[in-house]
């Protein structure tokens, strides 16, 4: 619920732990997102999305980044405007207890690659696309 989410966000902030995907409100998301981390001169933009909240309503004013191509495209454009060298889109998606990703995941994966960023937090059988020029 809202109280648990706010507690978690407050705790992470107090410990200096960077986070993305859940926000206190729209202003919080606008200020913090995309999450840009710079290490050894490399600027990494982290994007984070989920398929849903397991049927639970997200109480206002909390924001959870849901998988939505239009929003993701806007976020990738924002990351590019921040001069990110690398864009990683962490996707909480897929079906449990299956060894191959469903077609909708394959299609979204291909679209993400075409947009410039792709990573997944779930190991499944997958194919690589060589993106080097």
Give residue ranges: language-model regions:
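Acidic, metal/ion-coordinating pockets
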Residues: 1-133
